[in-house]
Amino acid sequence: TQRYAVPMFEELANSNAPVRLHSPNGLHVREMTPETALLMKRAGMVTVRLSLETSSAWRAVKDFSGKVSADEFNNAVDALFSAGYTSRDVGAYILVGLPGQSKEGVNDTVEFAAGCGVQVKPALFSPVPGTVEFERAVEAGMIRENDDPVLQNNTLRTIDFWDDNGDGYNEFRRIINAANSKNL
C-alpha cells in the first residue's frame, strides 16, 4: 500500500482529476487506516470492497482467516465511515463453500458484516492449486487433485453447498437481502 497505492492516491487527490474509482477486488483491512481511507476519498474512490472472507472461529483456528480479525475489520470500517463513506459505498466479500464450512458459519459471517454496517457481497469459493485451501478441498472430497481446473471451478460445485431443491440457496439470498437492506 505504502509503495504503490498511497503515492497514486496522493497524486490523484492533488490533481483534482474528475475520477470515480471502484475497488472490484477486496482490499486488505489491515492496510485501511484513517489516513488511507481519507486519502482514498480525496482521490475519488467511491466504491470500496473489503476482504472479510469469513468470521468463523473454526477458520481462524485452522489458520485460514488469520489475516482478518474482527477488531481489524471493525477498525477498517470505522476508518472508512470517518472518511465520509456510507454503508452504500462499502461492502465486504465473504466466501461461501469453503471446505468444512457450514451454512450457520456463513450466516454468522453475514450477520457480522451487516452488523458492522457494510453491504455483504458473497463470493463462491474456488480452490486454487497449490494453496492450503485446495488441499483441504481435496481432503474433504470436494474435488480431485488431478481434475481439469474447469471441474474444480465454483460454478460447477455451487449445488454442493445448498440442498438439491434450491430452497437453501433461496433462503441464503433472502438472508443476504435482509442483511443488506439494513444498511441502505
Region roles according to the model:
Residues 94-95, 123:
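Conserved beta-strand segments of the P-loop GTPase G domain that flank and frequently precede/overlap
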